Amino acid sequence: MKLAVVVQRYGAEINGGAELHARYVAEHLARHHEVEVVTTCARDYVTWRNEWPAGEDTINGVRERRFPVRRERDPHDFGRRSQVVFEQPHSVADELAWLESEGPTSPALVRYVASRDAGFDFAFFFSARYYHAWHGARAM
């Protein structure tokens, strides 16, 4: 079975909650299945700046594929949209705009996960609050 573990950041030195959980899941599943981690080139969860090169690598025996983030987070825009979504009546369109503003926004990552060429039988998305999880799950 070919599995995708899709997470906003990935690496041996990334110790965030969802990111570390995703790494543990990927490493465990890779003992029994073909696993590919699909992630962004971002290292910093505040800026989402592209710091790693796009492309493929192997970390702890797990194949990883990185995609660029389209743009860094604008903290003022994100703060304004967060205030609307968390403190005011709002629409689904407002929530989707917040999701885009929060980042990391990587349409190429979403296209890849959903493509027939990738050939995934199943995908695990970490975490639901991010662009790649919402759009990736809907695209599959």
Residue ranges with predicted function:
Residues M1, P107-F124, Y131-M140:
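Glycosyltransferases and closely related glycan-assembly transferases
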Residues M1-P68:
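N-terminal subdomain of nucleotide-sugar transferases
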Residues N15, F125-F126:
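Active-site-adjacent beta-strand anchor residues
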Residues A12-E13, R73, Y131-H132:
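Short glycine-rich, flexible loops that bind phosphorylated cofactors or substrates
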Residues T40-D117:
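A conserved catalytic-core segment of Leloir-type glycosyltransferases
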Residues C41, F126-R129:
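Short, well-ordered beta-to-alpha junction loops that form the rim of enzyme active sites
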